[in-house]
């Protein structure tokens, strides 16, 4: 029995290749059942995200045969030639597979080192496999242990503590300055991808109120509905800025949208209560001279890049600690798995012995019922049991001796405790 992880990700293939073997969530249950049958394995799970598709298997067969079956199934299921995906596939087996799964869950293999979203995606993959009935004892235990490792890494290292995107860094900086965002009012200028991410982080941090200003209201309204924000036009910014404790801007404008005079008026209306401002745009949305105002804390994208560079360095240090935790926990899982294999062997051997005993006992009972001498029956039973239990070990010892397999012979003598009996 072995554990296998096979996949394709952002490091091994461009999106044009990755999208060819991504799995539609609506068809995942069918895919899991098909894979079980086509690849002839015990258990399977599938993780499919925009950056990676990975298949996790527990199988009994020859590894090379499993590889061939899996590639053939991927070809058939996705209607894509093997030559398109084979160069991008990576394969891990047993402890390497366990180690890989744990690294993925901890964000150590992610495009953004330490990102937490992958753990949620792995939990979803686990739930889908459970619901499809494609997962049993070993894969279930592996996923549970993997989730535990990810939690341990988050708790014991700083892998996720530092912001490594300008959107996340902006919100973190605001949170640090205000000590919490629950009572703050935020004005977001723009409605592009960066501002959407900022809005998402603000919403997750329970910010007091968000107002979105954009040139076209339709796009801003689409975003605002998701986070319960108000929407205004760019022309309305001057009358609303006085209400904002935080202003974060990122538009595609070629000229500044927020000037020094506009901010001065807002500060006067606020009785010079400070405003925290972040300009994420290039070219800048906020005039450089705004930084001269005493009650304004203005940060540009360059200021944040400096913070992010330090944070990335901190994450890399934390990643070294995380790798150590992963290695230790994958060792623990493999020890559990070996124990499970030993237990299976003991159970199988015990069942075999009990079956042999029951057959011989049944014959002995018949002999006793037929009036045969009880001592003779017991002697015959003991003799047959001894011969039965001695047959396999005797054959193994003779085979090892005749084949000159000294190591095997010593091992067998140790197993049967022969030398200590002499």
Swiss-Prot record:
The active site is at residue 50. GO terms for molecular function: glutamyl-tRNA reductase activity; NADP binding. The record marks 100 as: Important for activity. InterPro entries: 4pyrrol_synth_GluRdtase, 4pyrrol_synth_GluRdtase_dimer, 4pyrrol_synth_GluRdtase_N, GluRdtase_CS, GluRdtase_dimer_dom_sf, GluRdtase_N_sf, NAD(P)-bd_dom_sf, Shikm_DH/Glu-tRNA_Rdtase. It comes from the Bacteria. Keywords: NADP, Oxidoreductase, Porphyrin biosynthesis. Its EC number is 1.2.1.70. It is an enzyme of class 1 (oxidoreductase). CDD domains: NAD_bind_Glutamyl_tRNA_reduct. NADP(+) binds at residues 190-195. Substrate binds at residues 49-52, 110, 115-117, 121. Pathway: Porphyrin-containing compound metabolism; protoporphyrin-IX biosynthesis; 5-aminolevulinate from L-glutamyl-tRNA(Glu): step 1/2. Pfam families: GlutR_dimer, GlutR_N, Shikimate_DH. GO terms for biological process: protoporphyrinogen IX biosynthetic process from glutamate. It catalyses: (S)-4-amino-5-oxopentanoate + tRNA(Glu) + NADP(+) = L-glutamyl-tRNA(Glu) + NADPH + H(+). SUPFAM superfamilies: Glutamyl tRNA-reductase catalytic, N-terminal domain (SSF69742), Glutamyl tRNA-reductase dimerization domain (SSF69075), NAD(P)-binding Rossmann-fold domains (SSF51735). Possesses an unusual extended V-shaped dimeric structure with each monomer consisting of three distinct domains arranged along a curved 'spinal' alpha-helix. The N-terminal catalytic domain specifically recognizes the glutamate moiety of the substrate. The second domain is the NADPH-binding domain, and the third C-terminal domain is responsible for dimerization. During catalysis, the active site Cys acts as a nucleophile attacking the alpha-carbonyl group of tRNA-bound glutamate with the formation of a thioester intermediate between enzyme and glutamate, and the concomitant release of tRNA(Glu). The thioester intermediate is finally reduced by direct hydride transfer from NADPH, to form the product GSA. Homodimer. Belongs to the glutamyl-tRNA reductase family. PANTHER family: GLUTAMYL-TRNA REDUCTASE. Catalyzes the NADPH-dependent reduction of glutamyl-tRNA(Glu) to glutamate 1-semialdehyde (GSA). This is Glutamyl-tRNA reductase. It comes from Colwellia psychrerythraea (strain 34H / ATCC BAA-681). The lineage of its organism: Bacteria, Pseudomonadati, Pseudomonadota, Gammaproteobacteria, Alteromonadales. The gene is hemA.
């Amino acid at each position: 029995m072995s554990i296998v992880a096979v996949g394709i990700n952002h490091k091994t293939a461009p999106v044009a290749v990755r999208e060819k073997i991504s799995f539609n969530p609506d068809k995942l249950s069918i895919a899991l059942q098909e894979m079980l049958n086509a690849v002839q394995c015990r258990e399977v799970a599938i993780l499919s995200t925009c950056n990676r598709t990975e298949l996790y298997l527990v199988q009994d067969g020859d590894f090379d045969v499993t590889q061939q079956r899996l590639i053939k199934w991927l070809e058939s299921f996705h209607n894509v030639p093997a030559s398109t995906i084979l160069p991008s596939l990576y394969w891990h087996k047993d402890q390497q597979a366990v180690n890989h799964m744990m690294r993925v869950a901890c964000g150590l293999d992610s495009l953004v080192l330490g990102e937490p979203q992958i753990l949620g995606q792995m939990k979803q993959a686990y739930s889908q496999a459970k619901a499809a009935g494609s997962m049993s004892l070993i894969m279930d235990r592996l996923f549970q242990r993997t989730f535990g490792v990810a939690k341990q890494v988050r708790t014991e290292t700083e892998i996720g503590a530092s912001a490594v995107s300008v959107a996340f860094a902006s919100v973190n900086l605001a949170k640090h300055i205000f000590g919490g965002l629950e009572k703050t009012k935020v004005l977001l200028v723009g409605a592009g991808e960066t501002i959407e991410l900022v809005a998402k982080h603000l919403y997750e941090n329970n910010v007091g109120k968000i107002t979105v200003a954009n040139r076209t209201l339709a796009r801003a309204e689409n975003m605002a509905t998701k986070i319960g924000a108000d929407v205004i036009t760019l022309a309305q910014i001057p009358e609303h800025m006085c209400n904002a404790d935080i202003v974060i801007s990122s538009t595609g404008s070629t000229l500044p949208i927020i000037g020094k005079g506009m901010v001065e008026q807002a500060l006067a209306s606020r009785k010079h209560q400070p405003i925290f401002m972040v300009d994420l745009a290039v070219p800048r949305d906020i005039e450089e001279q705004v930084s001269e105002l005493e009650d304004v804390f203005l940060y540009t994208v360059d200021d944040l890049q400096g913070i992010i560079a330090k944070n990335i360095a901190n994450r890399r240090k934390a990643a070294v600690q995380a790798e150590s935790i992963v290695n230790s926990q994958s060792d623990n899982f493999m020890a559990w798995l070996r124990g499970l294999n030993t237990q299976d062997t003991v159970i199988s051997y015990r069942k075999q012995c009990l079956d042999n005993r029951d057959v011989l006992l049944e014959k002995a009972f018949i002999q006793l019922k037929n009036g045969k001498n009880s001592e003779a029956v017991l002697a015959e039973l003991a003799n047959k049991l001894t011969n039965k239990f001695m047959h396999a070990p005797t054959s193994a010892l003779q085979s090892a001796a005749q084949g000159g397999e000294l190591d095997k012979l010593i091992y067998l003598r140790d197993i049967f405790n022969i030398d200590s009996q002499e």
